[in-house]
Amino acid sequence: MDIFGVLNMVCGLALFLYGMHIMGDGLTRMSGGKLESILEKLTNNKIKAVLLGAAVTAVIQSSSATTVMVVGFVNSGIMKLSQAAGVIMGANIGTTITSWILSLTGIEGSNIFIRLLKPSSFTPIMALVGVAFIMFTKSEKKHNIGAILVGFTVLMNGMDMMSAAVKPLANVPEFTNILLMFTNPILGMIAGMVLTAVIQSSSASVGILQALCVTGAVQYSAALPIIMGQNIGTCVTALLSSIGASKNARRASLIHLYFNLLGTILFMAVFYAINAVVPFGFLNDAANAAGIAVIHTTFNVCATVVLLPLSGVLEKLACLTIRDDEKQEEKDKEFQLLDERFLAQPAFAVEQCRVVAGRMAKLTKEALYAACELLDNEYDEEKAERVAALETRIDHYEDKLGTYMVKLSHANLSKADSHTLSMLLHSISDFERISDHAAGLMHSAKEMHDKGLKFSEMAGKELSVFTKATRDIVSRAVKSFETGDLEMAASVEPLESAIDSINVKIKNRHISRLQKGECTIELGFILQDISTELERVSDHCSNIAVYQIEVPQDELDAHEYLQSMRHVSGNSFDLMKKNYKMLYALPKD
């Protein structure tokens, strides 16, 4: 093989890997995070876990991606270690679908139906349709279908290019001697393991082996141990991803390694023991692409059948390898859902952000309610400390969520997920500001307590109405955020408008009492601070509700939306505002 042959082979490999990436990415985007959600919820039954692991891997075309995802699930506490074993075994079966697809390149025959099965017969049409979908349609779904079709075409062309480049190697004695060396099971395993560890894809390394089969120099006696080694080499990706993860996540990656290692040892021990007694005649035959797919599938299915009942043993072995440290402090689990391994599956990562943001929303509501109680009732130092602690915790939520979502924003997001991420980024900022205002209310209550100050009876009643209305608007904003209830979100802005009116009236009444000498200037400043904090809380609630309504419509101009809400006649805005004013009417002077 001359330098041009080497370049053609490398180019074919590059196209092969890139095509696999495009196709897998398109399939992942088509699933929209649904596969990951199913995997998360339906893995209690071992058989079901295997089937789901196989199905997910067959769709996303990567056992490494599935295993890394499982490591992330275990690390975040979504999945138990005992559930992970079945999914990992299923992933090994699912990855064999790629070798069956690639085996189509080896189909030969003059019959019209056989020729139609050859990729070279239908990939040109797939490429044409795929490019048309990508270039001339606006539908995101069709773009994803186009990516799948184009990716498959590039993958197959890369396979053909590799096969054509290595075909002349059949006449090179050195190449034949190297392959003969790999008939030694140990050397063959090492070769397959190293190749897969380097390119981090068993599907790709099996594809390379299938391409080499066109030389006619690859015998099954060499191909079999290479395939065994490829199954061990694919564990490297999961092992690397588990670095820095929780102990259970590292154990999940070890289960993957132990499964493939023990499966390989058992399979080869039984196979070569039988071969010593009753020699398998096919071992000296030239391997073909379909035969490689058969061996790959047979090994993974047999290993799963034998080791699935022993998954508990694999789990114990992983636990013995990585022991619990009783002295180690328990890790903060609040943000384990924000696992960076999920960034490779953007749709699922967005859902995890929504879950964590929902927790932040509940904490914000708790902080605001506690602060209002400090104003309505006797000052409680323990409750004040709780508000301060919640405010600090919510700040931490914003920092963690914001950092994670900025990283996620660089991923290949669908339009819907991009909108959701934008809504979440805006909303967590408002939740954080509400917690700041809750802390401000707490400080005002503390100041009054420390100085022995107290509002007049009428001022106290008015403030009670104000805090009640504020609690209501926070509750509505949080509920609409958690549930996505747009009707609930639409009820927030009329209440915010009513709260603005309450704020103005309370300030006017305070000025009147000040002029009559019924209130002191010092209390007036405190009331001014409290009113401002409560009114701004309602503003942030309004923002959160608007994000819920506007983002699904590909809009994010809160000011324009609010202006249209208040000026369009004939809608229910005025009626709801009127009802809220009646509900939260201030007591008569």
Which sequence ranges carry the predicted segments?
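Short helix-coil transition sites and intra-membrane helix breaks within transmembrane domains
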Residues: G24-T28, T57-A65, V166-K167, L195-A204, ...
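Membrane-interfacial helix-loop connectors
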Residues: M69-A91, T95, S99-S121, M159, ...
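Hydrophobic core segments of alpha-helical transmembrane domains in multi-pass membrane transport
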Residues: M9-I22, G53-T57, I125-T137, V150-M162, ...
